[in-house]
Amino acid sequence: MNVRGLGRLMFGFGMIGIGAVSLVCDSYSLQWEPVGSLLPNLGRLSGAILCLGGLGVLIGRLNMLAAAILTVFLGLWVFALQAPQAIAAGGSDWKALSGTWLGFAEDLAMMSGAWTLLALSDQDDNDAMAPWLTDARALRIARTLFGIACLVFGASHFAFSDITATMIPSWIPERLPLAWITGAGHILTGLALISGILARLAATLEAVMMSLFVLLVHVPMIVAGPARDAMQLDWTMLFVALSLAGSAWAVAGGLRDKPWGFGKGARADA
């Protein structure tokens, strides 16, 4: 399985998981889908869209259509739900701002992952869906948006390093410095993806790091048995983390024709 296939697999199962939790709990996806009182009682419809979209991403003949639907649907989360809420909340300092915009960034990264999978699927198809949504420029925009999200991830690791450290398994030493290191990794990845310098290497390392978050942080939480009042949150966090890792692998797959280091043609926007 290549990098792009791994991204599609992880993203698809992540979407199915988020949707399944919404269906079981009959609610929206908590802070990742802050609908509030705008459209009550439609959580299961949202969950069904995510489940079907995730399933479609895994099926060869349907993956382009499914990726398009998820790009639009997650785009609504980002721009219709998260952005207005984050702007209205504001923030008096960078710590408050990073916390306010974290949900926006996580949804933006997942939207970027869906968009990247759409563009990559369309490149393999003889009949282009919409060139302006799937050409090299669109792929570059999706990659840049993922980079912006990574900057927010990094800022939140520093702003809430104490909380981040507690999420790291206790058997891993120096958890607080590790929270800083992973935060720096997010920021460096964001800068690389936005600038196009060392983008393939950065995206791949980001994907590895996010995959380790799934394995070392979120899976053990589930295995340990989440508290009943936190069950929906813990399961949703697991599948969001899986979707984010899948998005990172998809972004890395979109850079497969670029060199790993410096040199001619190394810039992702070249």
Identify the function of each model-found stretch.
Residues 25-37, 160-173:
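Short juxtamembrane and helix-loop transition motifs at transmembrane-helix boundaries
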